[in-house]
């Protein structure tokens, strides 16, 4: 095992227009999670960049630390006894850019590297989905590009990934306050209108087609939504 390992994980945008809980894409803004082996001192965690002084450095309470421990458990091997894990965060917290997914995926990848690489991409995505509760941010954080994802009743995740046109640029607009995912979802209705469901099925087909076929004139139509944006 190398003495030093660094993992980069991108920001993600999910719930894209009509692709609520189904579509997510990776952005060119990255967090880094690194491990540096030491001879003593146990495992310590350092936070740099965004969230410094706010994100806990308690290894067992930090999302990255929890994900690393999960990877070690799945692989059946212990993490190194000594080392410094440094989180360098560029992704804003609680702004809809997948900061928690980046932490989970980064921790799983780093933990997997440190415990024998026993998990493949499918297993890492499965564990990330279990920790996050859904794959729409975790999938593009791990696989990149535009991802369509579904989870069946047995928690099995199926993903279709598409490479995006390198000439595309994305602009993100974030609120000047933190909005937790749980709070945002709390305003959604428990049931939806049949016609709203049909509307979204039709429009998400246009949205995916716009990206795949580079028909960006269809984006305005494909982004229309009746399941979450009105709320």
Task: Give a label for each model feature.
Residues 1-95, 113-119:
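ATP-binding N-lobe of GHMP and related small-molecule kinases
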């Amino acid at each position: 095992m190398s003495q030093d390992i660094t993992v980069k994980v991108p920001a993600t945008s999910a719930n894209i227009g009509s692709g609520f809980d189904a579509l997510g894409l990776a952005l060119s803004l990255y967090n880094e999670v690194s491990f540096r082996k030491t001879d003593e001192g146990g495992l310590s965690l350092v936070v740099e960049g965004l969230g410094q002084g706010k994100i806990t450095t308690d290894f067992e309470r930090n999302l990255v630390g929890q994900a690393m421990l999960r990877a070690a458990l799945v692989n059946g091997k212990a993490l190194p006894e000594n080392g410094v894990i440094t989180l360098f965060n560029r992704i804003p917290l609680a702004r809809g850019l997948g900061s928690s997914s980046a932490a989970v995926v980064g921790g799983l990848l780093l933990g997997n590297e440190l415990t024998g690489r026993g998990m493949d991409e499918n297993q890492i995505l499965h564990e990330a989905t279990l920790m996050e509760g859904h794959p729409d941010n975790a999938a593009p954080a791990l696989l990149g590009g535009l991802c369509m994802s579904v989870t069946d009743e047995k928690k099995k995740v199926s993903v279709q990934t598409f490479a995006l046109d390198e000439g595309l640029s994305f602009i993100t607009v974030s609120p000047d306050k933190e909005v937790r995912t749980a709070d945002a979802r709390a305003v959604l209705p428990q049931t939806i209108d049949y016609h709203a469901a049909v509307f979204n099925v039709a429009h998400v087909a246009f949205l995916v087609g716009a990206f795949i076929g580079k028909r960006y004139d269809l984006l305005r139509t494909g982004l229309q939504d009746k399941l979450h944006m009105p709320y």
